[in-house]
Amino acid sequence: MGPAWLWLLGTGILASVHCQPLLAHGDKSLQGPQPPRHQLSEPAPAYHRITPTITNFALRLYKELAADAPGNIFFSPVSISTTLALLSLGAQANTSALILEGLGFNLTETPEADIHQGFRSLLHTLALPSPKLELKVGNSLFLDKRLKPRQHYLDSIKELYGAFAFSANFTDSVTTGRQINDYLRRQTYGQVVDCLPEFSQDTFMVLANYIFFKAKWKHPFSRYQTQKQESFFVDERTSLQVPMMHQKEMHRFLYDQDLACTVLQIEYRGNALALLVLPDPGKMKQVEAALQPQTLRKWGQLLLPSLLDLHLPRFSISGTYNLEDILPQIGLTNILNLEADFSGVTGQLNKTISKVSHKAMVDMSEKGTEAGAASGLLSQPPSLNTMSDPHAHFNRPFLLLLWEVTTQSLLFLGKVVNPVAG
């Protein structure tokens, strides 16, 4: 009999809802993947040891996905990195180090124990209840009923990652796959459907992470200002008619002359914000190549509030990825071969990773909205020297980064090429 297979599964759903704003207690600002300053007497939360690395991992992964996929991109760096870190708990020393170093951690500067405590702190902070936004992150382990897991592993994943363990009958792969999909669908309130594809009867474990985010704009768009049909230019030869939201509101934004792109920060109620990056026509690859932590820090320092004439499409996109083909290209090579040692899970050797699947969705639409029709042209970069209000017209492909502000964690990262692709 061949080796048994292990699946890593990550899912994410982001939904933005428009509603009346509450009184603000001050503007939120993107600081980039750097923790905010603390008083000298106050120790920094443990998650500050890991969030910059997660951001760097996200940017590396994005570039590989962009090189492979010309269309929409959307994934959750927090979901994928959490799943891999959780897996490392069941790996022996060499394999565990390979996983964490592949994520980008320097184990000399940040020992493994500190990394896991960082994830524990991050997940705990993200799970804190908030009346202003809904954020749910969870981890689950589905282990073949014929195997007995090591109690130390079960205790560790529960204590550090809040992971629940379930017994599963992988000899009946169809039924078990349906049960796991149903579980993930319930945890994401019906938004993530059929995330787990078919798998082999030799599967012995599925490690799943899910993240659900739902928030309301600090400054809502009026549905009466939404144009039912406006042109969105996928490329030089292709245009689509899409619903285009419109508002004149105070937002932080800038025009980066070096990279030829507009950068816009839109705040949600609660501790979250969206960063939208709109390259000038023909400049997407230039901007993507420059995606580095220092670029995000620069933007965070230069964003200034201004009354902005904003046009933003309603969109709903998703991303489904088999990351076993992508992860080796960014340093996670050896965890996918027969030499990887995950005997810390059950005490048995010859258990290898077969699949690393990830699915994420984003919905920035207004339910049931009906509005008039209009069309637009390719926009030019906003100019601060004109008498009219600066404007940002998102009628061509743009980047989307969604941040949780307290932890400075990059929850979602993507590119909108076709707003109506689903």
Curated annotation (Swiss-Prot):
SMART domains: SERPIN. Keywords: Glycoprotein, Protease inhibitor, Secreted, Serine protease inhibitor, Signal. The keyword Secreted applies. It comes from Homo sapiens. Its main location: secreted. Residues 1-19 form the signal peptide. This is Serpin A11. GO terms for molecular function: serine-type endopeptidase inhibitor activity. PANTHER family: SERINE PROTEASE INHIBITOR, SERPIN, SERPIN A11. The gene is SERPINA11. CDD domains: serpinA11. Glycans are attached at residues 94, 106, 169, 350.
